[in-house]
Swiss-Prot record:
This is Acetylglutamate kinase. It is found in: Cytoplasm. One of its GO terms (cellular component) is cytoplasm. GO terms for biological process: arginine biosynthetic process via ornithine; L-arginine biosynthetic process. It comes from Methanoculleus marisnigri (strain ATCC 35101 / DSM 1498 / JR1). The lineage of its organism: Archaea, Methanobacteriati, Methanobacteriota, Stenosarchaea group, Methanomicrobia. It holds the Pfam family AA_kinase.
Length: 289
């Protein structure tokens, strides 16, 4: 498609999305490749300049693991789930809030736009409870494992986000929550993004990842559009598996609770965020009712 055709195709979408709220979950290789992250941030800033209200939520699992190893603490996983003891949580907060969040805010500032970095602790944005012990398969047996300071979101108070958006800031949210006794908890970033989108009555939720979207069983074709019932059937049939399941489950919950559409997009490809939102076919998977 010619560049001028892309621009003309974008116009009605820009008009339709003006004033709408979009929650973007930053994840995948973009979190460890500075050039990819810079491109994604520029695209997010463009959305702000064309009139959308943008909220960014980021993860940071690989960076947390690297920092732990650098500090001589070996990360512990059981059945693919991280064990988060108090020291691990302290390191996670250091990485998520002190490094990644600040870095994203700085990139946004370099693009000439104002941003504020917060975590779920701020303004009681994310209230959570400690996750119950999980049954996971270890070898050939099932074990019940206490994951430590890992939380499940119980409540979202979006007031702090509304205040920032009203003042034309881009909020950048680190996935740390607080429980009702004041203890900090690590939260899955996909879940945090979905819950924030629901609380804000966002128009769109976009999950940026390392894959092109939801693929067919042969991994040769991307489903550009899926209804909730289709996605549920594909999970049940095993077509959707592995790490895509929690991402899609967050998207599905958002759509069930009022978000007009949720998208899974490969954030490693240049300007995919814009192409997904502003072209007819898109480049990832869009999930709707």
């Amino acid at each position: 498609m010619k560049r001028e055709d892309v621009l003309m195709e974008a116009l009605p979408y820009i008009q339709k999305f003006y004033g709408k709220t979009i929650v973007i979950k930053l994840g995948g290789h973009a979190m460890v490749d500075q050039s990819i992250l810079e491109t994604v941030i520029r695209d997010a800033v463009l959305l702000r300049y064309v009139g959308m209200k943008v909220v960014l939520v980021h993860g940071g699992g690989p960076e947390i693991t690297a920092k732990m190893q650098a500090m001589g603490k070996e990360p512990k996983f059981v059945g693919g789930l991280r064990i988060t003891d108090p020291e691990t949580l302290e390191i996670a907060q250091m990485v998520l809030v002190g490094k990644i969040n600040d870095g994203i805010v700085s990139l946004i500032a370099n693009c000439g736009t104002r941003a504020v970095g917060i975590s779920g602790n701020d303004g009681n944005l994310l209230i959570a409870r400690k996750m119950d012990p999980q049954r996971v398969q270890v070898g050939e047996v099932m074990q019940e494992v206490d994951l430590g300071q890992v939380g499940e979101i119980e409540e979202v108070d979006p007031e702090v986000l509304h205040c920032l958006l009203a003042q034309n800031y881009i909020p950048v949210v680190a996935p740390i929550a607080i429980d009702r006794q004041g203890m900090s908890l690590n939260i899955n970033a996909d879940t945090a993004a979905a819950e924030i989108a629901i609380a804000l009555s966002a128009f769109k939720l976009v999950n940026l990842t390392d894959v092109d979207g939801v693929m067919d069983a042969d991994r040769t074709m991307v489903y550009h559009r899926l209804a909730l019932t289709e996605a549920e059937a594909m999970i049940g049939a095993g077509v959707i598996a592995g790490g895509m399941i929690p991402k899609l489950e967050g998207c599905m919950k958002a759509v069930r609770n009022g978000v007009a559409s949720a998208h899974v997009v490969n954030g490693n490809r240049e300007h995919n965020l814009l192409l997904e939102l502003f072209t007819d076919q898109g480049v990832g998977t869009m999930l709707t009712l």
